[in-house]
Design a protein with these regions (language model features):
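Residue-level preference for the first positions of well-ordered beta-strands
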Residues: 47-48, 188-194
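Phosphate-handling substructures
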Residues: 57-58, 65, 69-73, 111-177
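A broadly tuned preference for mixed-charge, low-complexity surface segments
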Residues: 98-109, 150-162, 236-263
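A Trp-anchored, charged/polar loop motif used as the substrate-binding/catalytic surface
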Residues: 30-34, 171-183
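Acidic, low-complexity terminal tails and accessory targeting/binding regions
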Residues: 2-44, 130-142, 186-189, 201-278
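Active-site-proximal alpha-helix that buttresses catalytic centers in soluble enzyme cores
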Residues: 2-123, 166, 214-230, 240
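Glycine-rich phosphate-binding loop signature in dinucleotide/nucleotide-binding domains
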Residues: 90-93, 181-188
Length: 278
């Protein structure tokens, strides 16, 4: 997805960021992209790690993972090791409450990452982080399609606006951004937001403004995007994010403009209460 850049999405050069190149080896089974992303983190931001859960049991042939599928023993070790690694190698404190999909493997990932960091903080269950719940308005229509056509086809049809019972594409991204904006930690802190591959892939596609992705774009287990906002009102801020070793900036106003141009009413968006959008 990183090859798709337009006028509303820009890269930030590495020399504008403070490099954190850790010397300690990464935890086993952690996607390589996470360490290359860590090396580009800025200092003293209100940082969020929007991540897929850790290693779980195998799904069916369509990529559909039952809500009951747990983390594997290796997945539990990875989540705990990753939390310990982040706590020991970043100039950020993880001592902040987490948010998570209410599905067990996501909650367990957040809890184990906290435990690895030597913490025991609250984990708030967020329905917006459930797959494919954040994208769906009529589950009785969309959910059977999700199971029938598989996750990749479902996300691509969502991105193309060709899927009944789902939100407008921009709304799907804006609602998640609004959730993160309203749950930002204090400066110098890192908040965990644990979710699923479908939500993370759809969110990134919206941020990159693409209408089709493939399996190469698909987030691996325990792979995530680091994200922070400008210290401005939501509709005036830009979202900055690091994905697979590249830093990008997307003005939130461009997403709002896209949503409005599609003819949708702002009352459907889950915007922060202080946003007055006419």
């Amino acid at each position: 997805m990183s090859k798709y850049l337009n006028n509303t999405l820009s890269k930030i050069s590495a020399d504008k960021l403070t490099s954190h190149t850790p010397s300690a080896p990464a935890p086993s089974h952690l996607p390589d992209s996470m360490i290359s992303s860590v090396s580009l983190l800025p200092e003293n931001k209100r940082l969020i790690l929007f991540t897929r859960h850790s290693l779980r049991e195998r799904s069916d042939g369509n990529g559909f993972a039952s809500y009951q599928l747990p983390l594997t023993p290796k997945g539990r070790i990875l989540a705990k090791s990753w939390g310990r690694w982040l706590s020991g190698h970043l100039p950020y404190s993880l001592d902040v409450d987490s948010i998570s999909s209410p599905i067990g493997r996501c909650i367990d990932t957040a809890q184990l990452m906290q435990e690895g960091a030597g913490l025991r903080r609250d984990i708030t269950h967020q329905s917006l982080l459930v797959e494919p719940g954040s994208l769906v308005t009529e589950p009785e229509i969309a959910n059977p399609v999700f199971k029938e056509i598989g996750v990749l086809n479902f996300i691509n049809r969502f991105l193309q606006g060709n899927l009944e019972g789902t939100k407008n594409t921009y709304q799907g991204g804006l609602d998640i951004l609004s959730l993160f904006y309203q749950n930002q930690p204090q400066h110098g802190h890192l908040m965990l937001a644990v979710s699923h591959d479908t939500l993370l892939s759809a969110f990134l596609a919206v941020m990159f403004d693409v209408v089709e992705i493939d399996w190469n774009d698909w987030p691996k287990m325990m792979e995530g995007v680091f994200l922070w906002f400008d210290d401005k009102p939501f509709d005036q801020a830009s979202a900055h994010f690091i994905w697979r070793g590249q830093v990008y900036t997307r003005p939130i106003s461009s997403l709002l403009d896209g949503y409005r141009a599609a003819g949708y009413h702002p009352s459907k968006l889950l915007l922060p209460p202080e946003v007055q959008w006419n």
